[in-house]
Amino acid sequence: MPSRRSALRWMAAGSGLAALTPKSSSAAPASPLKHGKIKQSIVHWCFERGSKWKVEDTIKAAKELGCVSVEGLAPQHWDLLKANDLKCAYVGAHGFVKGMNQPAFWDANLKVIEERINQCAEYGNPNVLSFTGFADTTAQGGGVVSLEQGKKNCIEAYKKIIGHAEKKGVVLLLEHLNTRDSAEMKGHPGYQGDNIDYCAEIVRGVDSPNMKLLFDIYHVQIMHGDILRRLESCKDIIGHIHTAGNPGRCEIGADQEINYPPAMRKLLEIGYTGYVGHEFIPTKDPMVGLREAVTLCDVA
């Protein structure tokens, strides 16, 4: 449990938040949520990048829209989240280049993963994010690893830490990313885990209820499509969901190709109870895009 000192920090953090408002002229006061069957979350980095939002802006938006989490925030921001009754649905550990597919990076990665697991357990946050890494990290002090060896290495590495995650009641997530889009942060050419079935094999190979798949609908659409059947095929191992519009990792809506309401209904059908994080880079007023996303994903 957090210490008394942490509790005092939560109170101090919360007292200043009411004076902050998201940097948007279109924010309406009423939450768009009606059904609330999907636990919706906002991924902060997108709005920091696209709209120059501060953490306080994203928290304010989450509260206004009825979201229950602001995710991807480092632990130093968790007191502020706690003060506003919000979770951090996932926290990052190591990066997506130097991942778990190469033993050269195991020591550093496992150290920070263990630290994040402990922090999540203390604050009651559910997930720590991890990556396969790039196939070729020669320039980063690693080497070149084949698909098969990369899979074996990932499974071996995760088995070194998964017992600690189980003990602490925290889930370790593996994220699938697309390699087709070369635009910065819209795709990740060189990433080894660009096949959803490959990532699913790693997760299942670890064979733990605390090892799950981060199913990013945007990335899966670019690499594979067939979203609804892929959600079905992964239903036993999905631990987190991300959204964004395609093409362009833009807002969710009528101007892009992914139809999100059926995907959300599919999640309810397969019994998914985790978070759905909105991870699009805004191209217009961010509150307009977020409000639309929250409304589209608020299915009955």
Residue ranges of predicted features:
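Short acidic, glycine/proline-enriched helix-loop-strand junctions
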Residues: 79-91
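Conserved beta-strand positions in the central sheet of alpha/beta enzyme cores
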Residues: 71, 90-92, 129, 173, ...
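Active-site acidic/histidine proton-transfer and metal-coordination neighborhood
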Residues: 11-20, 32-35, 99-212, 222
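Active-site-proximal loop/turn and secondary-structure-junction residues that shape catalytic pockets
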Residues: 46-48, 74-76, 94-97, 134-136, ...
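Histidine-acidic metal/acid-base catalytic patches
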Residues: 2-63, 125-126, 184-185, 193-215, ...
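Catalytic domains of carbohydrate-active enzymes, especially glycoside hydrolases
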Residues: 57-77
